[in-house]
Amino acid sequence: MYKVILIRYGEIALKGQNRHVFINKLIENIKESLKGVGEYKLKKTLGRIYVFPNDNINQFIEKLKMVPGIVSLSPTAVCPLDFDSLKETSVKVLKDAINDYPATFKVETRRANKQFPYKSPEVSREIGAHLLRSINTPDHNILTVDVHNPRYTLKIEIRKKNIYVFTRSISGPGGLPVGSSGKGLLLLSGGIDSPVAGWLAMKRGIELEALYFHSFPYTSDRAKEKVIDLTKVLSRYCKKIKLYVGYFTDIQRAIQENCPQKYYITIMRRMMYRMAERIARKNGDLVLITGESVGQVASQTLESMNVINEVTNMPVLRPLATMNKTEIMDLAREIGTYDISILPHEDCCTIFVPRHPVTRPRLDRTLKAEEKLKAEIDGLLEDAIEKTEILEIKHG
């Protein structure tokens, strides 16, 4: 019965003269997500994209609901532009949706095709009456109308060549299609926050690359595998993600040997930003992305962010800046990264944490604490980047 998947794309429709660029990027991403699922046809109209699968419609839905830029989608029945066909199709669709009686419903009609002889309220009224007559019996009114709080809403869209009828609306990520806003480098740890930041960046159209700082043997290869697993989950929402496994061991040793203990975290984060900027500029990334949330830990006070940010001239996006931990954890569960993030494998940010880290560093004091390291910085970074491993991560 359901032969079409109706796709809605929300804010893209509000774009101006470059709207077609966003729509074409979304269609490109849809086609990429459906590779290997099966044969299909695709059609676009104003405000809608239609996918016509040859088979396995549920498999298509599972892939499509992960594509940023898609606000929602509906498995949809199609009928010709005549009222009798619409009546017959409406009964089938509503009966299929209802799993328990008695039930309440309403009909909503959108008449994009103004040549259709009936106006939207007339269609809703006539189809609603037909549904009551077809499903109820003289002895049992198991279906009633409730226009304010119905259990089921039958939706009808009248287009140029066909009528589309559906009840279900399945949420997608929304936002903009990945790649429509350029490319960014995510500083990815094995924790809860940074994968969520990466997902939110993708929703704003940013194509992700990721940099993980690996401090073997202080961090295990299992910590590295954990980050690879997180990247695989994020890659469900895009084509693929290039993951840089940064060699960070010698940098951390140098910080330990040359800097005051309470400044370990601040100076380590400054080195991460320096390394990230060099990798980003080399590979055409336009922005750095982090999982920082204001006040959450010592390195995420405003003073710390200011001092750490001083080493880079690149824009730094912090999608989680104003979120609390509960909000971030809820999003991590929603996107499928939470259970991996809480696995007990330490990353480089946790193994050298001083007992009393400075929480409100001043730039002059930080530069003084970093003084003994200054002559080594360029050499350390060049060596670390040269030893960095590059992986291409795809889901499945």
Swiss-Prot record:
<dbReference type="GO" id="GO:0000049">
    <property type="term" value="F:tRNA binding"/>
</dbReference>
<dbReference type="InterPro" id="IPR054173">
    <property type="entry name" value="ThiI_fer"/>
</dbReference>
<dbReference type="GO" id="GO:0009228">
    <property type="term" value="P:thiamine biosynthetic process"/>
</dbReference>
<dbReference type="GO" id="GO:0002937">
    <property type="term" value="P:tRNA 4-thiouridine biosynthesis"/>
</dbReference>
<dbReference type="GO" id="GO:0052837">
    <property type="term" value="P:thiazole biosynthetic process"/>
</dbReference>
<keyword id="KW-0808">Transferase</keyword>
<feature type="binding site">
    <location>
        <position position="300"/>
    </location>
    <ligand>
        <name>ATP</name>
    </ligand>
</feature>
<dbReference type="InterPro" id="IPR050102">
    <property type="entry name" value="tRNA_sulfurtransferase_ThiI"/>
</dbReference>
<feature type="binding site">
    <location>
        <begin position="212"/>
        <end position="213"/>
    </location>
    <ligand>
        <name>ATP</name>
    </ligand>
</feature>
<feature type="binding site">
    <location>
        <begin position="187"/>
        <end position="188"/>
    </location>
    <ligand>
        <name>ATP</name>
    </ligand>
</feature>
<dbReference type="GO" id="GO:0009229">
    <property type="term" value="P:thiamine diphosphate biosynthetic process"/>
</dbReference>
<feature type="binding site">
    <location>
        <position position="269"/>
    </location>
    <ligand>
        <name>ATP</name>
    </ligand>
</feature>
<dbReference type="InterPro" id="IPR020536">
    <property type="entry name" value="ThiI_AANH"/>
</dbReference>
<protein>
    <recommendedName>
        <fullName>Probable tRNA sulfurtransferase</fullName>
        <ecNumber>2.8.1.4</ecNumber>
    </recommendedName>
</protein>
<dbReference type="InterPro" id="IPR049962">
    <property type="entry name" value="THUMP_ThiI"/>
</dbReference>
<dbReference type="Pfam" id="PF02926">
    <property type="entry name" value="THUMP"/>
</dbReference>
<dbReference type="InterPro" id="IPR004114">
    <property type="entry name" value="THUMP_dom"/>
</dbReference>
<dbReference type="GO" id="GO:0005829">
    <property type="term" value="C:cytosol"/>
</dbReference>
<feature type="domain" description="THUMP">
    <location>
        <begin position="58"/>
        <end position="169"/>
    </location>
</feature>
<keyword id="KW-0963">Cytoplasm</keyword>
<dbReference type="GO" id="GO:0005524">
    <property type="term" value="F:ATP binding"/>
</dbReference>
<dbReference type="Pfam" id="PF02568">
    <property type="entry name" value="ThiI"/>
</dbReference>
<dbReference type="GO" id="GO:0004810">
    <property type="term" value="F:CCA tRNA nucleotidyltransferase activity"/>
</dbReference>
<comment type="function">
    <text>Catalyzes the ATP-dependent transfer of a sulfur to tRNA to produce 4-thiouridine in position 8 of tRNAs, which functions as a near-UV photosensor. Also catalyzes the transfer of sulfur to the sulfur carrier protein ThiS, forming ThiS-thiocarboxylate. This is a step in the synthesis of thiazole, in the thiamine biosynthesis pathway. The sulfur is donated as persulfide by IscS.</text>
</comment>
<feature type="binding site">
    <location>
        <position position="291"/>
    </location>
    <ligand>
        <name>ATP</name>
    </ligand>
</feature>
<keyword id="KW-0547">Nucleotide-binding</keyword>
<keyword id="KW-0820">tRNA-binding</keyword>
<comment type="similarity">
    <text>Belongs to the ThiI family.</text>
</comment>
<dbReference type="Pfam" id="PF22025">
    <property type="entry name" value="ThiI_fer"/>
</dbReference>
<keyword id="KW-0784">Thiamine biosynthesis</keyword>
<dbReference type="InterPro" id="IPR014729">
    <property type="entry name" value="Rossmann-like_a/b/a_fold"/>
</dbReference>
<dbReference type="GO" id="GO:0140741">
    <property type="term" value="F:tRNA-uracil-4 sulfurtransferase activity"/>
</dbReference>
<dbReference type="InterPro" id="IPR003720">
    <property type="entry name" value="tRNA_STrfase"/>
</dbReference>
<keyword id="KW-0694">RNA-binding</keyword>
<keyword id="KW-0067">ATP-binding</keyword>
<comment type="pathway">
    <text>Cofactor biosynthesis; thiamine diphosphate biosynthesis.</text>
</comment>
<dbReference type="InterPro" id="IPR049961">
    <property type="entry name" value="ThiI_N"/>
</dbReference>
